[in-house]
Amino acid sequence: MDAQELIGSAAERGDLAWIRLAVEDGRIAGARGEGPGVAELCRDVRGLTTLGAAAVSGGRLAGDALAEAIGTAVAALPEESRVAVAMSGGVDSAVALHRAREAGHEPVGVTLRLWTDPAGSDGERVCCSPAAVMAARETCHALGLPHVTLDLRSEFRRAVVRPFVSGYARGETPNPCIRCNGSFRFAALLAFGRRVGARKLVTGHYARLAEHRGRLLLARGVDPAKDQSYMLARLDPRLLARLWFPLGEQGKEETRAEARAVGLAAAERPESQEACFLAGDDYREFLGRHGLPRREGPILDENGRKLGRHEGFWRFTPGQRKGLGVAAGTPLYALHTEPRSNAVVVGPRASLARTTVGASPGRLFVPVDRVEAKLRYRSPASPARVAAEQRGFRLTLDDVAYGVAVGQAAVLYEDDAVVGAGLIASTD
């Protein structure tokens, strides 16, 4: 007999709930615990599989305790129709879940609980907050579907948050969403999908998949305003056959209209914030609390002449004007920072001009020599020549680019397909 004991707990505003499950041969043989709503939940889950228990509703504390207990232990035999659906608590993932069910699949909702800064000003609007986890669970249970929460707070802090802080300490401008989506988040979700026997992972991202040059590649979503292919660009193409992006052929308003039409409670939920772990704060305030305190240093022109003072080099990125506080006859921009001397070097916009960009680490997913290169999430793509290098690639831009920052992602497109991606390591 295969026996296993699962334990979970949750606390909020002085209330505590805990639950202990005895699992034998894949079913819950016994359940006990204490706290608001726990007794009823224990009664309801006895005799169920752990996956079946994930579809049982309970109060917030009791539900959180159950989710923690079963989160890493959910397992099932492969089912031809089963899919895992990444749930954020928002309208996009809710509609993706609905689409999966309407297509005849057997969806299992999964939410990653990730670390957010407890000192942040608006932690409830982020995609991985306790409120978002609860909203995701309620969406699944309202449709009679199982939902599992994976608590990855410590792993996320180690894999995403700490590199974000250390990148700024080196004078870079890192994009944590690229690191999160390109490796951490999808690795965890795909691993969960394998555990529950899911054939596909479904997400609410606005992106598509396309056959291009004989290979399945990521492609832009049809709505340019919502396209998220830049954030997903570092996904290994070998994983793409296991993914489904049902919203890639539509825009946000179509998604909200669909949610309203089918009565999803998430239809009017506000959009979650980027860089979720900031919990609503400006990144500078976050960095100040997590290892990069205010420290005065000089603002210099290109000849080394002192023009003013600043409160930390890491508060500036190439192309930035706001916060310089330097009076001059012509507009001045941050050109680069010097971490060792805590200096910020400023100059005219012309000094920001770049025509060559090196990416490392980086990859070309198919052989190409001409691309459209997107060097920041909100910037338009620029035509360029590309040459493969040992650990990445080098771009020669047709037109001058301004404010190119080390640490950002260079994402390469041919037509709408993502044909390469890497982290910017040098500019000339």
Language-model region placement:
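Short amphipathic alpha-helical face segments that pack within enzyme cores
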Residues: 40-43, 95, 188, 405
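Phosphate/pyrophosphate-recognition segments in soluble nucleotide-handling domains
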Residues: 1-7, 60-91
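ATP-dependent adenylation/nucleotidyltransferase module used to activate substrates
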Residues: 77-233, 253-254, 260
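AMP-forming adenylation/ATP pyrophosphatase catalytic core
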Residues: 88-91, 202-209, 214-428
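Short, charged/polar N-terminal "headpieces" of proteins
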Residues: 1-20
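Conserved active-site and cofactor/substrate-binding residues in soluble primary-metabolism enzymes
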Residues: 14-16, 36, 61, 65, ...
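Active-site- and interface-proximal helix/loop "cap" or "latch" segments in soluble metabolic
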Residues: 14, 18-76
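Catalytic cores of large soluble enzymes that bind and process phosphate-bearing ligands
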Residues: 58-65, 88, 128, 152, ...
